[in-house]
Each structure stands twice: as structure tokens, then as C-alpha cells.
């Protein structure tokens, strides 16, 4: 202990020894490790070392206060005194290299260790040394021993006891932060003693640059890190582990976000698909029902009798003396659906034509003179047709649906939607419409020359010339072809007959009665809840099953062609038994005329040979193809138009099938089907509206078609 006291006192005279200690330190450092392990050896060396460190320290006494001030916080971990020695080892080497690298910093680094030594010298009692070691994390006993052991390890060890440990450790931290930050407290005494000379001399040059940084290195000892090697490994591993965890967390978060986005996308796509499928499915027709069935098919009023169309182109017995013009106007309609017209007010005039399209109920009452009975053109099961004159002088036909008729409302909606899309010179034109409370009215162009039925079968009228018959046939065929081919979706008329073919003054045909027309969506067939049509014009498959195609219209048009050729009615009660049906009577004669060219048995005798034979023959051939029992084997209306409206070869209207060689036609079965249809539709012997042949050929003026029995009697007789 006396030696320890002397060492501080002797330290002042040893300034010249500053040059010597650096070389001595490496040699002594090699022996240091064993000395560090054994505390007794340091005291012996301490006598020589203090003078070495002291000469350099005395000048920077002023720096002493700040260093001890920094040390107290570091006293948290005094237990590792032996650890402090390695930092001390690092301090001895710094002086020489620092002096070489940067004069000022090395001096600073050298000076700080000296003040503690001076403090130790000024305070011979080891208590101050004990205080200084705790910050440096050496044990209090090592304080005095450090002056001895550092000389063995390195002369400046005592000055670096605590303050020196902090400056060198701190410089080491900035230079090599990862290794030294945890190892700053010098938990590496064993490792450092093993190889202090070479690493530490190299480290000191780095220390001067970062010499001022003391707290970081000191903070590490406070953490009580183990050996410096372990500290270095922990520091690097800690940083790497933190970064690794961060990367893993980011990867997991990114994967979770991507998975969430994918799930959301799939869910939305599935919902959209379900919505799309629902939207499409709600417009698909029921296998036994049609999309627009409510708008086109309506129940009949037994009291009113059977009507060929929802608008009543056929009239009841009380109105049979009315002109057949009312029949044609009774069912033609147009415009927009009811809900669209209410929301938009009036439809586009481009669709309905120029001029006024929407009329008030008061306006229509005025133009029809208060819907006077004298202006009635006809009356059907669902309303009356009135003749009226607009303010501009244009004559129109106004159809008024019966108030409170739900069927009439549906009919109105169907008609206005269909006719609003149809514009053709051979189709009846829509002028406007009216919606007022419960009133639903449609305004059509007035066709002045009545109907084909009127001109063919009216008594007291001149015989319809053959040229006019050909013109009517071609015009009506073009109108139907437009409905079937040029309307999208196609429109099936469903009630083609001579009473629904209007004639203008030039005998140009205009097809009317779209009340029974139905939009044929994408399917080729529709099954109706009720079969509507006129006996004598119904296709066999339609009458029996309600199956509807455009070929059903072709069959009905074939019956009209037979009317034009023969001048006979579709059903004639005055004819011999088995010949009441025009189609049944004409089938064998058609085959014979085509095979032999003999037209005498088919042609209307009233024409008195005033016809063109090849035109008659062409019309006969076309009619025979149209009335085939097999629907698919009938021609399309486009083919019919080409066959009728060409002067040369009309092509193969028969589709390669000779007349009479199609599916065998059982007229008895057809009659049975018609009877079943009558019972299904009307439930008994309710009279059918006989306005079918209105005008001069009403039930009251002719025994022909006086009622339901007149049309069905041939079928009843046929069954027996």
C-alpha cells in the first residue's frame, strides 16, 4: 500500500518516461494477461507505471472535472473490475499512434487518463480510486491495483482506470460501433489480455477521432454486458435479429394484405356473377310460359264470346252489322309500355312519327264527338274503336280499352311496346296514345278501304280483281316478313287472317291486329297459357298444344292465300260434309293442280278466267307449301315473298318436298285437336264471336258462321 502511495507521488517526476512507456506497453502487455488474472502483480508494476502516465496527465488537469462527472452515472456496474483493465489496455496504445495520426486528439486522449491519475495522486487514499473504478466497472480494489497492473499491461492504465476506459471505449464505439458498444465496458478481459498488443494499438488511432464520445461506451457497461466478444456478437446479432424480424413481419403483413385483397376480389366477382345470372334468369321464359304472355294473352269473356284478338277484331253478335274496318283497328296498337310513358311523359316522336303523339282524354273525346256511337268502327271484347278527326283534319281510329279491365291494361302495355318498334308501309301505323286515370286509348292511322275479308266475302260487292289479289298477297307477305326477319327480337303475329289485312285506296295491304303479337326472344318456340286465334287459320300444332313459332304465322298466311285463289271462307258450313274446312278441301286439289296444271277446280269461278295462269299456279304452289302439317317443313315468310314477287323461277318454295309427300296429315286428328282447343279455351258451347265475317256477312244476314256451332259443326260431323 505504501508503494501505491508512492507511485502517485513519484508520478510527477516521470514525464520523460512518456516516450518509454509506449514501447514498454506492448512488451508488458504480452505479460499482462497473466498479471491481470492475478491482482498481486499489479502493485509491483504500479510503482513504475504512475510516473509514466502522470507526466502526460498533469497539464490537462482542467479536464479532470468533466470526466469524473461522466463517470458517476457509469458506476451502476462496479462488479466487473477486471473488465476495466482491457479498456485500460486499449488506452496505453492510443498515445503513440494518436500522436502520430492527429496531434491534438491523441493528446486529448492521453490527457484524460492523466487527470484521473492525478486525482489518484492528489488523493492518495484509494477511496477515490475506488470511486473511479466503479464507473469503469472495475472493483474498488482494482483502483489502486490498476496503476500497477496497467503499467504491466500499459503505462497509461491507471490514468485510464475509469475515465480512460470511457474515452477509449467510446472512441472504439464510434470507430467500430457494433463490436465496441456492447464491449465498451470491457467484458473482454480474458480475450483482450490474450491479444491486446496488436488489436489495441490499431484501435487507438480510431479512438482519437471519436474520443469525445464517452457515454455510449459507458452506457454499455451499465447494461452489464458480458465479454466484449459476446457483446460484439450480441450487438451484431441483435441488429441482425431485429432486421430479420422486421423483414419477416413485413413479409407476413404483405402476404396477409394480398390474401385479403384476393378474397375481396373473389367475393365481389362471385356476387357480380350471381347478380348477372339473376338479372338474366328473370327475363328467361318459363318452360311453359312466355316472357310477354301477360301482355298478349288474355282470358275471354264468355258473355262477349270469342275474340280473335285482345282488341277484339272479331265482334260479338250485337255488333256484327258493323263494318269490318272496326275489326282491323280493334287490335292494332303502339307506343311505349305504361310504366315508361308515365315516367317519361311522352315517347320519342322519332319512334311514333312526327307530330303530336300524346293526347289527353278530353282531346280524344272531342275528336270522336264524345265517343258517339255513330262513330264506332267496331267493338270487341276489350273495347270499342271510334273514328275521329284531329284538329289538322287527319282521320284516325281511336281504340278505347274498357275501364277497369286489368286485361285491357296488360294488353295496352304489350301493344304499345310492340307497335312502337314496328314501322313498315305494309303494317298499320301508330299515331299516338292516351293515358288518363283508368282510361287507356290508342290512336292509329285510319285505313279507308276496309279489309280483305270485306272485299272477298261481302255480298253485293264487285269481285276483287286478280291483279289486286296478287298485290294484296305480296304486300301482306312483306309486312309479315318484316315482323319475322327485321324486328329484333322477332314478332309473331299469331292472328293472321283476312279480317286483319287492311286495304288503302290503292289496295295496298297493311297488316293490323298486333294485340296477339308476341315478342320471340332468343328461343324458337313459346308455349302459351291459352291458345288464341281464329278457327280455320290455326296451325295444327298451335291449336293442339299452343306451341308457337313463326311457322304458325306461315300456316295462317297460307290459308289467306287459299282465300285469294278460291274466294272461299276458311270454314264454310254450306259446303258438303268433309269439305267445310278450306284447308282440308284444298289439300288434294292442290296436289292435283301442281301435278297436272289443272287450275279449274281451285280458282275462284267469279273471276271468269280473268287471271294470269302462271301467277295463279305460283300462288297455289306457295299456299300448298305454307299449309303443310309439319311446321319445320313450311317455308319462311322471306321465301314466301320471293315466291310471290318474282316473274321468273321462284326457287324451291317446297324445300325439296313435293306436295302431298310431307308428314301425313290426319284431318280427323286435326278436327279433334280443334275441339279440344275449344273446350280448353271456352269450356263448353259458349258462342264464338262471329264478327270474324262482319259487315254484310254477319251472323244475322247469313246463315254462314252464325255461331260457334257453325264453325265447329264440320269437325263434329267429321268425328262421326
Swiss-Prot record:
The keyword ATP-binding applies. It is a single-pass membrane protein. Its EC number is 2.7.11.1. Residues 1-246 are extracellular. Mostly expressed in apical parts, including flower buds, and particularly in anthers. Also present in root hairs. One of its GO terms (biological process) is developmental process. Its main location: membrane. Belongs to the protein kinase superfamily. Ser/Thr protein kinase family. ATP binds at residues 377-385, 399. It catalyses: L-seryl-[protein] + ATP = O-phospho-L-seryl-[protein] + ADP + H(+); L-threonyl-[protein] + ATP = O-phospho-L-threonyl-[protein] + ADP + H(+). Glycans are attached at residue 117. It comes from Arabidopsis thaliana. The active site is at residue 495. It comes from the Eukaryota. The modification Phosphothreonine is found at residues 529, 534. One of its GO terms (molecular function) is protein serine kinase activity. Regulates the auxin-related MAX (More Axillary Growth) pathway during the shoot branching. The chain crosses the membrane at residues 247-267. Keywords: ATP-binding, Cell membrane, Glycoprotein, Kinase, Membrane, Nucleotide-binding, Phosphoprotein, Serine/threonine-protein kinase, Transferase, Transmembrane, Transmembrane helix. Residues 1-240, 300-349, 698-720 are annotated as: Disordered. This is Proline-rich receptor-like protein kinase PERK12. GO terms for cellular component: plasma membrane. The modification Phosphoserine is found at residue 528. Pfam families: PK_Tyr_Ser-Thr. InterPro entries: Kinase-like_dom_sf, PERK1-13-like, Prot_kinase_dom, Protein_kinase_ATP_BS, Ser-Thr/Tyr_kinase_cat_dom, Ser/Thr_kinase_AS. Induction: Repressed by auxin (IAA) treatment.
